[in-house]
Every structure is written in C-alpha cells, then in structure tokens.
C-alpha cells in the first residue's frame, strides 16, 4: 500500500469514527426529570390540600437545573391547561434555578391559601393533561404524583371511560390516599379503588405505587 493510499484509508476511518460519535450523541437518552403533580381539590379532600405543599417543597428540593415541574388542580374538568397552577423548566444556572423555585413555591402557596372545594373529581382528565405535559417536555425520567383519595366522580356529560392512556416510561405515585367514610364500613372499596387505578396505569405500560406516610418520602424522585 502506498503512503497516499494509507493516508486516504486513515482519513476514511477518522470520518467514520466521527459519524458514529455524532450518531451516538444524537441518540443519548436525556438525564433530566419531569414531574407533574395533581392536587385533588374536590369535596372534603380539599381539607387535605395544605399537606400537598409539603410534597411540592420536597420535589423542588430534589429537582435540578434542566428539570421540569408542573402543579395542577383536580376538579370538575381537569383536562385543560387552565388547571395548571404553576409550571417551570429550571435554568442551567443554579442561581437562576433557585430563583425560579422560590417563585414557583410562592404561586403554589397562594393557590393553597385561596382554593375552594370543587363539586366533582376528574382524575382521568388530570392524568391526560399530565401525560401531554411530560410528552412535550420529553425528559429522561417522568413522574406523575397524585395527591387524592383516588375516588373519581364525574359530572354529567364528561366522558372518560376507555380513553387510551399511554403511561410507558412513566412512574405514577398516589400520595396521601385518604379513606372515605364508606371505606370504613367496607375496606374492600378502598382496596378495589386502588387496584383499579394500578391496573389502568400498568395496562398503559407505566409503574404504579402508593405512599401514604408523608414522613417517608426518601424513595420519591
């Protein structure tokens, strides 16, 4: 092989290596996190809303620059961006991200102070809105946190049955799932309610769990 041919072959190998490196970089999975927290404001559960602030502050403390978060209410009709109380994607600069977190916490605190009970509970609509948000952000890790008793109660005219819910790559965590008065008479209602939501999430390809002890959030995020 002549010196010219050897040099040309070496250049081709360098070009191939560069192309492969670029392809590898382009297909890398994002490492950031997206969190969507749903807060049930319906009926008597509205009295629990103050506890949600603890969860939100914990989430803010765990999230890093380039992570995204949104907090939205569950009420009569939850499949709408109007239900989003606050949302943010944190700046790469830590000082700016901390300013964003403080502003976010302030908006949440205002919501908690002013919230009023909703007559109905559209959990499925809230989940659909959450999935839209997380899909748009396209983060590497996706979490939906639901602060609710998980009892769906739809107003007349709201259709939510058999809606396709794609939970692939999403962790869904139900928090502070309080027991209804009827659950005390028949605990099977509580257990079957949670089992139905677990089945819906897992059938959609997601992962489901329940955390009722708000003092043990170490495994969250």
Across the structure, where does each feature detected by a protein language model lie?
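Exposed acidic/Ser/Thr-rich ligand/metal-binding surfaces
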Residues: 33, 117-167
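Von Willebrand factor A/integrin I-like adhesion domains
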Residues: 186-221
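Bacterial N-terminal signal peptides that target proteins for export
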Residues: 2-14
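C-terminal motif of bacterial Sec signal peptides marking the signal peptidase cleavage site
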Residues: 21-24
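Bacterial signal peptide processing site
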Residues: 26-28
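VWA/integrin I-like adhesion module and closely mimicked acidic/polar interface patches used
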Residues: 151-196
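Von Willebrand factor
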Residues: 31-141, 143-145, 178-181, 214-218
């Amino acid at each position: 092989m002549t010196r010219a041919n050897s040099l040309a072959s070496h250049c081709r190998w360098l070009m191939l290596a560069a192309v492969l490196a670029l392809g590898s970089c382009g297909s890398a999975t994002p490492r950031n996190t997206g969190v969507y927290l749903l807060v049930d404001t319906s009926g008597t559960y509205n009295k629990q809303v103050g506890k949600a602030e603890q969860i939100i502050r914990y989430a803010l403390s765990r999230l890093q620059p380039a992570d995204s978060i949104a907090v939205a209410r569950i009420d009569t009709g939850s499949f709408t961006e109007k239900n989003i109380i606050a949302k943010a994607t944190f700046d790469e600069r830590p000082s700016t991200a901390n300013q964003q977190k403080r502003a976010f916490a302030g908006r949440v605190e205002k919501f908690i102070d002013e919230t009023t009970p909703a007559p109905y509970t559209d959990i499925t609509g809230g989940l659909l809105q959450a999935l839209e948000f997380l899909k748009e952000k396209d983060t590497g890790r996706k979490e939906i946190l639901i602060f609710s008793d998980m009892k769906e109660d739809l107003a007349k005219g709201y259709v939510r049955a058999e809606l396709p819910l794609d939970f692939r790559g999403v962790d869904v965590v139900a928090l502070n799932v309080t027991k209804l008065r009827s659950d005390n008479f028949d605990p099977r209602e509580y257990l079957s309610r949670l089992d139905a939501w677990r089945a819906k999430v897992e059938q959609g390809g997601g992962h489901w769990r329940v955390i009722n002890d708000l003092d043990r959030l170490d495994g969250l995020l």
